[in-house]
């Protein structure tokens, strides 16, 4: 009888556990944000079905969070999503189905950190110069460069200032932006949240409240993309530092998120890329370093040239639709990008039937019996400098495809290109990879679907 009771109790517990398990969603709507720290120990949203869809209302990155000391990572990305079936050592394929800018205006510019307002890192550990509080709550009082004030002592608290800044109005058709003058910037600043369209759950101070207007009448074409898109690192870190360049700020840092170089290389997933080709139509294959992957999104930009050379571009709110798929037993050190064909380097674009025919004829003339059937792949690398980032991309590609680094260098030179994602240290190493190799590493079907 006692044994029967134990069995019954066990069955009841198992039954309760089963009931409490949330059912995986086919479509998940995301409008919640982290406090700037990507922490694998925190509960994720979801679960989402393998093959499911994420629709996210993202909030601006960079400047807004940088002006909000309670956000401890420099960005305000979405809470990570748990993808059903994703295990450590797998990969998650993310297809960007659509990106829509919702902001009507934004402000940006080149930054300079203010030395008495942070400890070690102005993105992570802000200190009020008045009352000395760490991560102080703030309010926006009025408009202009001194508008961000400590809630406790009313001291100006923003850890950054703009050395040259602008306010840009955005075309409602999503095609153009124009920088406005002093009066236009003032008009936008006085109705800041309405113009920025920050989601209701976002806590950032709107950057347009600063009303910068150093550039007036500058036209810019809109081509929105995601500066942050990826999976959760396996150790808690500030979201904007999830890459080898900004992540280097964490090495030996005087705050709780300090890393060694070895830890950074092991745990980061390079979700903060700022690669302008991560736009509608592109696919990215991301490493899974925690159970469920933890897909997160943010830092949408209205436009950007390669390098984001000013340090910041036009941060906007928007609506993003993604489709995710788990690739089992595809272990990656960092992301792989499959850009739209028009975004590929000339040398890496898929060959036409006519080009292949002519290549076969030339090969036969010199006794080459078979030419490669190959597809373009962009391997992302990051590091403290662009040189280190390039070395990282080449090293990752060599390990993944079981090639020597000199072979990768040759292939990237004649069938691809090294392109800057972000200065100082994110690049893509793009080159044509043989179909046989892609099949061996289990990513051929994903790449064929993108380019076939």
Regions found by a protein language model. Give the residues of each.
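N-terminal, charged/glycine-rich beta-strand/loop interface patches
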Residues: 2-276, 287, 291, 348-351, ...
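Redox cofactor-anchoring modules in respiratory/redox and cofactor-processing assemblies
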Residues: 261, 289-373
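Short, charged amphipathic alpha-helical segments flanked by flexible coils
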Residues: 284
């Amino acid at each position: 009888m006692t044994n029967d009771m134990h069995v019954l109790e066990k069955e009841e517990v198992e039954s309760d556990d089963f009931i409490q398990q949330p059912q995986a969603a086919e479509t998940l709507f995301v409008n919640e944000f982290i406090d700037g720290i990507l922490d694998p120990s925190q509960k994720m949203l979801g679960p989402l079905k393998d093959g499911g869809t994420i629709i996210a209302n993202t909030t601006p990155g960079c400047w807004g969070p940088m002006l909000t000391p309670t956000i401890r990572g420099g960005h305000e990305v979405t809470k990570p999503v748990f993808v059903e079936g994703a295990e450590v050592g797998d990969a998650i394929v993310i297809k960007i189905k659509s990106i829509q800018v919702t902001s009507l205006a934004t402000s940006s510019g080149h930054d300079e950190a203010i030395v008495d307002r942070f400890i070690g890192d102005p993105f992570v550990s802000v200190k009020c110069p008045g009352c000395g509080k760490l991560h102080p709550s703030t309010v926006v009082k009025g408009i202009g460069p001194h508008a961000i004030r400590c809630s406790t002592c009313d001291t100006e608290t923003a850890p950054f200032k703009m050395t040259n800044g602008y306010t840009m109005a955005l075309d409602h058709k999503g095609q153009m932006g124009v920088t406005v003058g002093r009066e236009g910037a003032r008009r936008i600043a006085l109705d800041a949240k309405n113009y920025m369209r920050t989601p209701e759950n976002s806590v950032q101070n709107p950057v347009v409240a600063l009303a910068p207007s150093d550039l007036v009448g500058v036209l810019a074409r809109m081509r929105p993309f995601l500066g942050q898109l990826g999976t959760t690192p396996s150790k808690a870190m500030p979201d904007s530092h999830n890459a080898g360049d900004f992540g280097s700020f964490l090495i030996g840092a005087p705050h709780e998120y300090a890393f060694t170089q070895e830890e950074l290389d092991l745990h980061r997933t390079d979700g903060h890329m700022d690669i302008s080709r991560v736009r509608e139509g592109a696919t990215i294959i991301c490493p899974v370093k925690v159970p469920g992957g933890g897909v997160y999104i943010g830092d949408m930009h209205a436009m950007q040239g390669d390098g984001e050379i000013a340090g910041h571009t036009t941060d906007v709110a928007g609506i993003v639709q993604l489709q995710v798929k788990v690739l089992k037993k595809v272990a990656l050190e960092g992301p792989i990008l499959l850009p739209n064909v028009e975004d590929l380097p000339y040398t890496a674009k898929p060959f036409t039937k006519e080009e292949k025919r002519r290549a076969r004829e030339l090969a036969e003339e010199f006794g080459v019996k078979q030419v490669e059937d190959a597809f373009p792949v962009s391997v992302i690398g990051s590091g403290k400098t662009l040189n280190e980032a390039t070395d990282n991309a080449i090293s990752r590609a060599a390990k993944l495809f079981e090639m020597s680094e000199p072979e990768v260098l040759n292939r990237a030179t004649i069938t691809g290109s090294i392109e800057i994602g972000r200065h100082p240290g994110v690049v893509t190493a793009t080159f044509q990879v043989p179909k046989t190799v892609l099949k061996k590493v289990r990513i051929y079907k994903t790449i064929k679907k993108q380019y076939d």
